[in-house]
């Protein structure tokens, strides 16, 4: 994220209201804009193509397909991306740029294999048991694979510091998707639901191809050293578990409520809970600005303190190390408190706006009853995300693992318990899980503050560890003495 910080520093140098608004807008573009582009495209398609006139069963099939494509493409990419990101960071630090393409190829293979391993049996069930048209099933599978490739290639574009291009490629892909949908329905007279799914698949593939071309344009040399990449999965297995548990925790409460009386089943294949899922979506959007605020604040303030501490460790005096460490942790505490304060104000304003405005547009009943508790849960969850990033800064993978494990398990158990209660408390599982993860991560950061010196100076090795044949015990012979 260093590239974002450099760009933001240039923007904020002017110290004007317009500069601050520009910086906030830039942070939004590189973080949440792609998601809003996709959502906006689907909504625009629905309005222009007359989606509301489609039968209830067909709409349910489209909603279930699109929901599963997004959720499981994220879950598929989760185990690999954190480790691959760590590998690329080390490669760039060591200036071994020719090792980036092997990393890309290995990650691409692993993502496609895992996605296919999960997707093909599901699609076979959808066709054979759900009796869904084979062409529709195949198109949905292609859209799923395309989105996996999109999410995967985004990791490498961030290394190229082409954050704007990620949003631009999403915008291009979704513009083509909208044009294709209009062409298929208005000109060719094709069925609305399938035309929307096919158009989105085309848009995702176009986005993936543009990202792939950019990666290949930046990194042309290939060292063909693939074993190094695989070795990182053994060395940093905790990153695999952390990223997967955090991503699973985002959706595990939804999975629980998909098996309650809120359940909607389509074609004996897709199971989801529209009421709970919609409340979840509203709660996430209520707190989404915290991601933008966090990136802006960390890149502008904490990263500078962290860099100063790192430089002091490398070649500074003990007094310099101690002072920079104290300043760094004071800045960390300040950033967390600022994030909580700013996000609380924004979330409260958005919550009140939703409560007042949304009922006028049909959002009422159980959705608005479930929404408040989930909004609180996502508020704590995004603060937990910030703490996990700080733990990554200090290379405390054990702390991050404990936090995400507690978050995921308590969210699941709490959701199972709250599912039997009132609608108002359906989100208590997420609240309890997020608070558990937040508490573990908070105390782990405090532990790191107290034991930072041991963590930095006592965690390494004085001698290089090698695996080879043991040398002979004879170290001196009479012949050597005569020489």
Task: Identify the role of each PLM range.
Residues 1-43, 60-61, 230-239, 456-483:
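N-terminal membrane topogenesis motif
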Residues 63-89, 247, 251, 280-305:
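Small-residue-rich midsections of specific transmembrane alpha-helices
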Residues 78-82, 139-160, 195-209, 350, ...:
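Short runs within selected transmembrane alpha-helices of multi-pass transporters and secretion channels
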Residues 94-104, 277-357:
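Specific pore-lining/lateral-gate transmembrane helices of multi-pass inner-membrane transport
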Residues 153, 168-190, 350, 402-423:
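Alpha-helical transmembrane segments of multi-pass membrane transporters
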Residues 169-216, 424-447:
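Hydrophobic alpha-helical transmembrane segments
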Residues 199-299:
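Transmembrane helical elements of multi-pass membrane transporters/channels
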């Amino acid at each position: 994220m260093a590239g974002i910080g450099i760009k933001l520093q240039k923007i904020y140098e002017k110290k004007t209201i317009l500069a601050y608004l520009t910086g906030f807008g830039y942070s939004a573009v590189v973080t949440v804009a792609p998601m809003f582009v996709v959502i906006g495209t689907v909504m625009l398609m629905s309005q222009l193509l007359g989606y509301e006139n489609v039968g209830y069963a067909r709409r349910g099939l489209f909603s279930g397909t699109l929901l599963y494509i997004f959720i499981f493409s994220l879950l598929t990419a989760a185990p690999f991306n954190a480790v691959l990101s760590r590998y690329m960071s080390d490669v760039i630090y060591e200036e071994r740029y020719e090792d980036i393409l092997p990393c890309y190829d290995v990650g691409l293979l692993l993502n496609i294999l895992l996605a296919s391993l999960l997707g093909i049996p599901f699609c076979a069930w959808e066709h054979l048991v759900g009796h869904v048209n084979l062409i529709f099933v195949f198109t949905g599978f292609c859209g799923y694979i395309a989105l996996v490739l999109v999410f995967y290639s985004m990791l490498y574009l961030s290394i190229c510091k082409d954050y704007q291009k990620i949003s631009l490629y999403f915008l291009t892909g979704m513009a083509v998707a909208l044009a294709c949908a209009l062409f298929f329905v208005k000109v060719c007279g094709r069925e609305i639901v399938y035309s929307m799914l096919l158009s989105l698949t085309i848009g995702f593939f176009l986005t993936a191809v543009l990202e792939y071309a950019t990666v290949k344009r930046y990194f042309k040399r290939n060292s063909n050293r693939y074993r190094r990449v695989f070795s990182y999965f053994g060395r940093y297995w905790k990153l695999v578990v952390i990223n997967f548990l955090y991503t699973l925790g985002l959706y595990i409460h939804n999975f629980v409520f998909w098996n309650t009386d809120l359940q909607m089943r389509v074609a004996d294949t897709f199971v989801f809970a529209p009421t709970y899922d919609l409340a979840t979506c509203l709660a996430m959007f209520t707190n989404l600005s915290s991601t933008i605020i966090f990136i802006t604040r960390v890149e502008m303030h904490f990263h500078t303190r962290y860099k100063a501490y790192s430089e002091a460790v490398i070649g500074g005096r003990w007094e310099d190390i101690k002072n920079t460490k104290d300043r760094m942790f004071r800045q960390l505490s300040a950033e967390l408190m600022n994030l909580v304060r700013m996000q609380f104000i924004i979330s409260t304003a958005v919550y009140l706006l939703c409560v007042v405005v949304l009922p006028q547009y049909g959002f009422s009943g159980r959705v608005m009853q479930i929404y408040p508790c989930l909004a609180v849960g996502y508020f704590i969850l995004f603060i937990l995300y910030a703490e996990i990033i700080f733990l990554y800064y200090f290379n405390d993978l054990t702390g991050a693992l404990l936090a995400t494990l507690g978050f995921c398990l308590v969210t699941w158990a709490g959701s199972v318990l709250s599912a039997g209660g009132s609608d108002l408390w359906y989100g208590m599982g997420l609240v309890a899980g997020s608070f558990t993860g937040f508490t573990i991560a908070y105390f782990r950061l405090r532990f790191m503050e107290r034991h930072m010196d041991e963590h930095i100076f006592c965690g390494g090795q004085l001698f290089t560890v090698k695996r080879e044949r043991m040398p002979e015990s004879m170290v001196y012979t009479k012949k050597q003495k005569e020489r």
